[in-house]
Amino acid sequence: MSTIRSFEDLKAKRQEILDRKAARNGKTIINVSLATCSIAAGGKVAMEAMQDEVAKNGLTGVEFMQSSCMTYCYAEPTVEITLPGKDPVVFGGVDENRARELVTEYVMKGEPVEGIIPVNYERVVL
């Protein structure tokens, strides 16, 4: 990350963030926690399974991201999915089978899938 040294740097960073956010409009965002604990619990396997399922079903408009700790240690691996126009939903205990189910049921059909972690806070996303 670059250092912001002036007001112009700050304005440029703001524009970069706004451009990144605008590019995501209309896309499904799948954010997989890949902190050490999640990787140990199978997070990489879950992400690869979801990417495979998206490709297998020919889905477009799906963007994968990876994040560090989501603070749900008891529920690793965790996946946050944001469907266009919807609030993010976090799923826990996502193994390979559940990862595939998340794509076919939640991403493709919008149907709830077991493993939703209730959210009790408001999140600010840049």
UniProtKB/Swiss-Prot annotation:
InterPro entries reported for this sequence: Thioredoxin-like_sf (IPR036249)
Swiss-Prot/TrEMBL keywords: NADP, Oxidoreductase
Regulation of its activity: Inhibited by oxygen.
Coiled-coil ranges per UniProt: none
SUPFAM superfamilies per the UniProt record, alphabetical: Thioredoxin-like
E.C. no: 1.12.1.3
CDD domains named in the record: TRX_Fd_family
GO molecular function, one term: hydrogen dehydrogenase (NADP+) activity
Superkingdom in the source lineage: Bacteria
Catalyzed chemical reaction(s): H2 + NADP(+) = NADPH + H(+)
pH profile of the protein: Optimum pH is 8.
Presence of the UniProt keyword Nucleotide-binding in the record: no
Task performed by this protein: Catalyzes the reduction of NADP in the presence of molecular H2 to yield NADPH.
Subunit structure of this chain's protein: Heterotetramer composed of HndA, HndB, HndC and HndD subunits. HndA and HndB could form a heterodimeric intermediate in the electron transfer between the active site of hydrogenase subunit HndD and the NADP reduction site of the reducing subunit HndC.
Protein name as annotated: NADP-reducing hydrogenase subunit HndB
